[in-house]
């Protein structure tokens, strides 16, 4: 089982570069194997207890103490359970009930599995697993440059054509996974290697087609530095900025003039221009159902009339293709203001948990990775996409079970 975990830790970032959607499958397998590992360890411990009757009572006492200890964190998950409950309730008045319930079930099972694994015992043989992760990331970087310089040599083995945007998901996965490797190197005193890896990944993202990943990783680096130099007030600063910006975003999206902005600043970037039109359209739709929203996973079923279609430089664009390409707008559109408030409460909660970490480097990297993931979600991807949720859980599990046990006393 240890070999399987090591192989998957290497495979997820490397295979993910060529096929980003593969993370939905590979991370799920990784979580299932890790979950079974925890069950096996528990069964072995239980078997050892029953072999010696003298150990039964102490083991029961320990179990009761553990339940009492874990009950406090369980109570602290009240806001999480409220958000989950509201997501389920929103399915009941969604545009497409069956699809919404199916999406909710998939996301809930994946998040529950990720939560269970991330709160299990740390990995054994962590040095070997850390090496596997770093080699996996380096392999992903190598594969990107092979595809970039050869016009998709490997991709064209399986597909008829290649375009650089096909690596966007892999770049997004790399941008958040690289932070795990960075903290591993930094905690081992390899500052030069840390800087080299950051610059290499930043350069890779700058020549890729994934602007969201480049911005997320670049701003993540700035966040890392600010965390180290603004220790006393950084949590308040980042929390206020994120929450205020998120609350104002739907208002700003409503007020913008996408046609004028696109012609002035985005004439050569049609993809970015299209997003402005999408955000403006979504903001107007939010006004129609501001409190409850349209229901979870309803974005792609919202109809647009002929008069709402976008005519941009002779091209016809749909004002809402599948999803809003912005997590805040999608949450507000589908779950309403109620869902947005609950979501931002979760954001505050996780930022507060990061601020409570004692290790300075681990805290700074955690902030950077969180902001990286958040920014990508503000520009790209459906918030309910399984591969993207899996990517976030993957990094969380690595940080908690692979990195944290060696450098942080859990406070």
Swiss-Prot record:
Topology with respect to the bilayer: Multi-pass membrane protein
Keywords associated with the record: Membrane, Transmembrane, Transmembrane helix
Location(s) in or outside the cell: Membrane
Major localisation: membrane
GO cellular component: membrane
Residue spans crossing the bilayer: 15-35, 78-98, 101-121, 133-153, 166-186, 207-227, 233-253, 328-348, 361-381, 383-403
Family: Belongs to the O-antigen ligase family.
Name listed for the protein in its UniProt record: Putative polysaccharide ligase RC0486
Source organism (scientific name): Rickettsia conorii (strain ATCC VR-613 / Malish 7)
Upper lineage: Bacteria, Pseudomonadati, Pseudomonadota, Alphaproteobacteria, Rickettsiales
């Amino acid at each position: 089982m240890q070999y399987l975990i090591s192989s998957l830790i290497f495979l997820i970032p490397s295979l993910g570069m060529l096929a980003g959607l593969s993370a939905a499958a590979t991370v799920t397998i990784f979580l299932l194997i890790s979950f079974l590992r925890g069950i096996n360890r528990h069964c072995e411990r239980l078997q050892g207890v029953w072999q010696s009757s003298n150990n039964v009572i102490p083991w029961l006492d320990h179990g009761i103490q553990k339940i009492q200890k874990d009950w406090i964190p369980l109570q602290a998950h009240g806001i999480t359970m409220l958000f989950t409950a509201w997501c389920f309730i929103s399915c009941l008045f969604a545009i497409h009930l069956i699809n919404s319930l199916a999406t909710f079930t998939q996301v809930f099972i994946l998040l529950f599995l990720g939560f269970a694994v991330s709160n299990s015992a740390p990995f054994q043989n962590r040095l070997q697993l850390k090496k596997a992760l770093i080699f996996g990331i380096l392999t992903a970087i190598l594969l990107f440059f092979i595809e970039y310089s050869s016009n998709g040599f490997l991709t064209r083995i399986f597909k008829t054509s290649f375009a650089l945007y096909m690596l966007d998901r892999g770049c997004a996965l790399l941008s958040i996974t690289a932070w795990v490797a960075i903290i591993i190197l930094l905690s081992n005193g390899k500052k030069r290697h840390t800087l080299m890896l950051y610059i290499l990944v930043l350069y890779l993202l700058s020549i890729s087609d994934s602007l969201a990943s480049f911005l997320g990783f670049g701003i993540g680096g700035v966040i890392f530095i600010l965390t180290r130099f603004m220790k006393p007030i950084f949590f308040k600063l980042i929390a206020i900025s994120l929450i205020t910006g998120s609350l104002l975003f739907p208002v700003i999206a409503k007020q913008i003039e996408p046609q004028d902005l696109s012609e002035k600043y985005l004439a050569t970037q049609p993809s970015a221009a299209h997003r402005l039109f999408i955000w403006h359209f979504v903001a107007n739709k939010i006004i129609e159902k501001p409190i409850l929203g349209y229901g979870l996973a309803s974005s792609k079923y919202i109809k647009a009339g002929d008069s709402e279609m976008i005519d941009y430089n002779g091209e016809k664009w749909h004002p809402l293709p599948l999803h809003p390409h912005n997590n805040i707008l999608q949450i507000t559109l589908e779950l309403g203001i109620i869902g947005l408030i609950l979501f931002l409460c979760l954001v505050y909660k996780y930022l507060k948990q990061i601020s409570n970490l004692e290790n300075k480097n681990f805290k700074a990297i955690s902030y950077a990775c969180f902001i990286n993931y958040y920014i990508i979600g503000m520009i790209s991807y459906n918030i309910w996409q399984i591969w993207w949720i899996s990517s976030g859980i993957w990094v969380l599990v690595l940080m908690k079970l692979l990195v944290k046990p060696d450098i942080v006393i859990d406070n």
